[in-house]
Amino acid sequence: MLGGQPFRFVGANVNPMHGEEDRRRTEDLFTALRQDNLSVARIWALGEGQPDATEWQIKYVLFQAGPERVIEETLLHLDRVLLEARRAGVRVILTLSNNWADYGGVPMYLRWLGLPADGMGKEAFYLDERAHALFRAHVGRIVNRVSSLTNIRYSDDPTILAWELMNESTIDTPAGRQARLYWVREMARYIKTFDHNHLVAAGLWGYSMRSERADFIAVHSLRDIDYVDSHLYLQNGQGNVSLQRLYDFLDDRAYLAEQIVRKPLVIGEFGFRTDQGPRYLGLPRSRWFAELLRRHFQNQGAGALVWIYEPYH
């Protein structure tokens, strides 16, 4: 619901934060989103680097260079991003950390702490209170920020639709999944202590096995998680690729969201490989997109965001 009315959307993942050209073309990006009737943008409000990061990284990529140094210029640019989104009438989902090493992510948090950053080492991010404290500091800094351009606190800004704790969280062991459940509960509750205006999403990748599905349900059933979110890339280990498999995937997630968790369903990322040109497995790629959206909204899905939208490339 938005303003007392049902809110459903087609949106896009966009990257106005990481890179010189991407930052320079922020206004163009939101103009294009508006023209293409894409009403929600998912943006990564993250970027972690080493204290000896290059000047270019500091100027165009990072939110932090080491655990002690916050890059104010990046926060100023995030102010600009939200202003341009507001002008374009686009709502924003801000993702606050990354499971992967792109722009730092969980591996960089672990390196800051002198911990193993690969494979099973990721469990430490959810287990180590020092990692919790570093992430909470970033969350508090973003959610409580007052825009230099609008003088609106982010926690009060209606341009923001939701906070997403992580991009594509994955964990391989039962102990790690239990630790992540506690972490999601802690961080979602932390945001809700000073922001009662916005939705909070967990940011899990999804599931392909029964054990992962049970954990997915447990995380999304937490009181302070407001909607179910899953990513959809059938070619990446989520089953054999066919239109029927696409329908089965969407029907399963819709049933889980509506009948078990009883929360709205958002497909936070979806896409189909482009290495076969305009066709994918014998069908036009446009047909795959159309069928995904048709089935998702037929199932009363709340929204879906394509990966990735680059109108000027």
Where are these regions (language model features)?
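Active-site mouth of glycoside hydrolases
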Residues: 1-263, 274-287, 291-313
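Short acidic/histidine-rich active-site segments
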Residues: 267-269
